[in-house]
């Protein structure tokens, strides 16, 4: 309830009333030394609320984006890939690699070589009337991803959370990505 009130107050004070994207950051709080142990925390958690004007590109929504499979993996070796954290070194590395390859997003594989997610969006394919997405073990189980899964179930569209390989992606009928900011975006090439 406190966070909700703080969000509402921040938006009101900012004067923003449309296309507002909120970045909410919560840390354990101030430290008595730069040591990382939670034992050194003084007081309550620190909450940072950053409102910014941000609008998803209509052109991107209509024309779609390009992907390439990157060498950077999503795995538990560095951090739990299901947590939305500022410490996303592997996602940043995948983003840099995608940029070097001249594409919009990097398609990331899990440690076993199965499709996991993209560096900043969730990944789906459509094959023979079925919608496929990763198992969720190596991706942030995002809000929009969850909505797509729920809607498929509600409307009787077969939705499979499963392991699949890049070859399945290349022979898919359709490919799309999802994110809370931009919604559902078509993928025009992988």
Identify what each model region corresponds to.
Residues 1-107, 111-112, 150-190:
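Conserved alpha/beta cores of soluble small-molecule-handling proteins
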Residues 142-147:
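Feature captures the catalytic cores and cofactor-binding loops of soluble hydro-lyases/lyases
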């Amino acid at each position: 309830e406190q966070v909700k009130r703080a969000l509402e107050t921040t938006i009101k004070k900012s004067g923003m009333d449309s296309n507002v994207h909120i970045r909410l950051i919560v840390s354990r709080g101030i430290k008595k030394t730069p040591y990382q142990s939670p034992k050194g925390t003084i007081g309550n958690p620190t909450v940072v609320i950053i409102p910014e004007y941000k609008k998803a590109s209509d052109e991107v929504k209509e024309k779609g984006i390009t992907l390439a499979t990157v060498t950077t993996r999503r795995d538990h070796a560095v951090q739990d890939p299901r947590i939305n954290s500022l410490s996303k070194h592997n996602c940043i590395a995948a983003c840099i690699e995608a940029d070097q390859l001249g594409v919009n997003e990097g398609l990331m594989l899990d440690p076993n070589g199965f499709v996991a997610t993209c560096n900043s969006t969730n990944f789906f394919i459509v094959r023979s009337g079925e919608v496929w997405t990763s198992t969720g073990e190596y991706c942030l189980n995002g809000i929009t991803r969850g909505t797509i899964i729920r809607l498929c179930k509600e409307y009787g569209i077969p939705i499979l959370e499963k392991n699949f390989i890049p070859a399945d992606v290349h022979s898919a009928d359709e490919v799309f990505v999802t994110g809370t900011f931009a919604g559902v975006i078509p993928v025009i090439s992988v």
